[in-house]
């Protein structure tokens, strides 16, 4: 039984061993690695630098009275005129180097007085302040200025100021209604110790509701730039006599300015300790007489400032001889050359030297 079972099993095994070998599975070919497609190169967007907004060009303005470059808010503001003492004990005075225009003219008793006119530059110290006179009031009227003074003679206070205040000038009298703008110093004796400042005067002017601005176009003279250095003379001088000493000027070609002297000594401004300097010196001859109605003991000068007369204009180291003309009390004194053309002044401080007809003024200057 057992034998019969083994034979078939062997046969099966033999048959299984003699069959054909199985076909091997094909080995897959290795596929080449895919080539990476390069990413497209993107050109960088150019960065535009932010454009800076240019700073606005400052507005150029020129002061009405002296033609100097100035802050537009100051170039046309109300001028302030202040009467200044020239007694020997009042020297040295304060405020000259801040003034746009300076007047000097004969006064009582053989003395003279100044009037300083301020516009774009402030003066922290002005004085000694003295009383007004009619012709100074009318010069202040040329600019419709605030008029600073310590009282005045009878005619000034009773006739001239009342007829001009609020119309041709704006009264700033230390003795009548504007005293807050003034003070007296202890280092000098009255009446040579009254002082003020442009700031104090403008505060009072504002409180009185005086205008803050000059009437447009009023008081404006023609101006010019400096002559080239090559055209300036190497030296020059001017001498203008007054009762208590001459006013002298020495021309400086380097700065195209006139260095001022009083009685042969350098004129120094007590406010800043610096030499007083002018850019233009104007000499006006006017007929001088004396007021027959002057108070007893006084001889009040009267200057004929309406009409025409002789004028010499010193600028750029040279002199132009011509005439002055003023139509009425509130009109600007105009300056004309020999051909009748209005004379242009150099930008900067103007000194106006008023003398009596016949006064001998000497100078060294081409012209």
Language model features with spans:
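C-terminal motif of bacterial Sec signal peptides marking the signal peptidase cleavage site
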Residues: 13-16
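Bacterial signal peptide processing site
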Residues: 18-21
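Extracellular mucin-like PTS domains
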Residues: 23-56
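A surface/extracellular/periplasmic glyco- and lipid-processing/surface-interacting theme
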Residues: 55-101, 108-367
